[in-house]
A protein has these predicted regions:
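Short glycine-enriched nucleophile-adjacent loop
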Residues: 163-172
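Short amphipathic alpha-helix adjacent to the substrate-entry channel of hydrolases
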Residues: 92-110
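Alpha/beta-hydrolase-fold serine-hydrolase catalytic core, especially in secreted/extracellular enzymes
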Residues: 235, 244, 253-301
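N-terminal cap/lid segment of alpha/beta-hydrolase-fold proteins
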Residues: 22-75
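The feature captures the conserved acid-bearing segment of alpha/beta-hydrolase catalytic domains
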Residues: 176-253
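Short beta-strand element of the alpha/beta-hydrolase
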Residues: 74-85
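Gly/Ser-rich "nucleophile elbow"/oxyanion-hole loop immediately N-terminal to the catalytic nucleophile
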Residues: 69-76, 121-164
Length: 301
């Protein structure tokens, strides 16, 4: 793909309408997913999940353990904010994926449309607003989450255009790790007009470990994802290409499928020190390293 098309290509469908679809990028390419038959199933955690509007913030939605008695005495409750594909303001499309992650003991947040608001795309400020909300909610009298959120353990993850947002948020001192699914950045082109999306110049500002995942050859962002991994030289990074997964991969499989397992294990290992989860990524015999369906690389892991 020509470099000038990469940013446009990841402006995918927003509630069924393509904001940008440059020559060579078809809807079929955008929607290519791993066939469901025979695919690994999502592996939920021990917590039953409830989802609800964020108190006082109608543009945000929360996925969290229904019962919070275990937090923080027996378990920590880190925060993960999700950036949607197409930078769509509609995290409910990913509810299965986000619910699986939350079920492992995480507070998960995403954006939702506000009734009567002008239609627009999700941006980095929306992700920051979710972190701001969690900080306030952790101190709000009457909040079920008061004193329970592990604000020193904040992640931002996103898919496609949402992956751009996660890279941008990697510079926020509150964000300790990022996940970039089916996305990545390139070196800025000489003379190119300013873009709202990050370039490789954003990578040195990322200060925590990076998870980079793509859908291998059927994913038109494969080369960009790999190039992004190669350009990271200041923080640990793990790169994985799931064979035959395509650009949409498994995020819309029941419970988010294999992608949800990878995201959950990354967070469990990074924030909760779960060695079994970390075995997916650590060492030459890591479970993804020895899985014939994956091509992987890592640095500093």
């Amino acid at each position: 793909m020509h470099k000038t098309n990469v940013a446009a290509a990841v402006l995918l469908t927003v509630t069924g309408v393509c904001f940008a679809q440059p020559p060579g990028i078809t809807r079929e390419m955008i929607e290519r997913a791993l066939p469901l038959e025979g695919a690994p199933l999502a592996e939920p955690g021990p917590y039953k999940i409830t989802s609800e509007p964020a108190f006082g913030s109608p543009g945000l939605h929360v996925y969290r353990p229904e019962t919070l008695d275990a937090f923080p005495k027996k378990d920590s409750l880190p925060l993960m904010v999700w950036g949607n594909g197409g930078c769509a303001i509609d995290s409910t499309r990913y509810s299965g994926f986000l619910t699986t992650i939350a079920s492992h003991g995480f507070l998960v947040m995403g954006t939702v449309p506000v009734e009567g608001a002008a239609r627009r795309q999700e941006n980095a400020d929306d992700i920051r607003a979710a972190i701001d909300w969690a900080e306030k909610e952790n101190a709000r009298t009457g909040s079920p989450l008061i004193g329970k959120i592990a604000l020193d353990k904040v992640a931002v993850m996103g898919q496609s255009c949402g992956g751009f947002l996660s890279i941008m948020l990697g510079a926020d001192p509150r964000v300790k790790t990022i996940g970039v699914f089916n996305s990545g950045v390139q070196k800025p082109a000489a003379g190119a007009p300013p873009s709202p999306f990050p370039t490789a110049d954003a990578l040195p500002k990322v200060h925590g470990p990076v998870l980079l995942i793509n859908g291998s050859d059927p994913d038109f962002m494969l080369a960009t994802s790999l190039a992004t991994f190669d350009m990271i030289d200041n923080v640990p990074a793990f790169y994985g290409a799931r064979h035959n997964a395509g650009h949409t991969a498994t995020v819309f499989h029941p419970g988010g499928g294999e992608y949800a397992n990878v995201a959950s294990n990354w967070l469990l290992w990074t924030f909760k020190g779960d060695k079994q989860a970390g075995a997916m990524f650590v060492g030459k015999n890591c479970s993804l390293c020895t899985n014939p369906n994956w091509d992987v690389k890592s640095k500093g892991i």
